[in-house]
């Protein structure tokens, strides 16, 4: 397997308890960074229905453009190569307004992100794939069960082992999301691009090479760094069988403790562990005296 990397079809789930203003800010900060070229950038936002209206309002107020069905089809046909079922390399890292123009869609020049509402995830919805540009799929879900389902569908379509994002104040749900998603890194309440590459929003190792583990046919799920490039040599010495001896249940160690030997009942045999110096100093004779 390769050390890293793999495709990142990153889902971003905004759960009903999330700080919505911050979640939207994080999403825009991440998706507009390098015009969405980072493979860890969000490829779809999955929003609980109860937040959808406020989500759309906030995004529109910040120059994000929601495509209608006709516009979605035009952008989809241009952004995703139908033969390869992969992103058109011409759009990678390009501004949203440029992409819209090439697709035949008129949007304001200051548009930051093109957002397409989709009914489901799958090959029949090309914009649910990795896009590496400021084009974002958008799904509305009833609850966290459906939110998790859509997030995993995104990963299964082409992002296994990479990254997944969740915005929530429910720590138990965040933990469950982390346990459920088949990814190497789960970004919680942070922008995915900056969060996945590490150091800025968390303690992940800073790296632009993100391992996807066995899910993505990589050898590691970590952020690849110099540590992964160091050859470690191990000398394996022969190990003998364990040596042991039995000690008594009580050990007396204070001064003059050998006097207790006189009071111990049932002693028929004694084994004295000593050395020549202790013999010369007379310490062994003291022990023998009390044993007799």
Annotate each language-model stretch with its function.
Residues 105-241:
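Conserved C-terminal structural/oligomerization subdomain of aldehyde/semialdehyde dehydrogenase
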Residues 242-292:
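ATP/NTP phosphate-donor binding region
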Residues 54-59, 176-180, 283-291:
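Short, aromatic/basic amphipathic alpha-helical patches
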Residues 2-122:
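ALDH superfamily catalytic-core signature
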Residues 5-7, 37-41, 129-134, 158-161, ...:
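Short glycine-enriched loop/turn motifs at secondary-structure junctions
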Residues 14, 116-117, 138-142, 251-258:
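Short acidic-hydrophobic, aromatic-tinged amphipathic segments that line or gate anion-handling sites
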Residues 48, 99, 134, 254, ...:
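Residue-level signal for inorganic ion chemistry
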Residues 47, 168, 190, 273-274:
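Short beta-strand/turn micro-motifs composed of small residues
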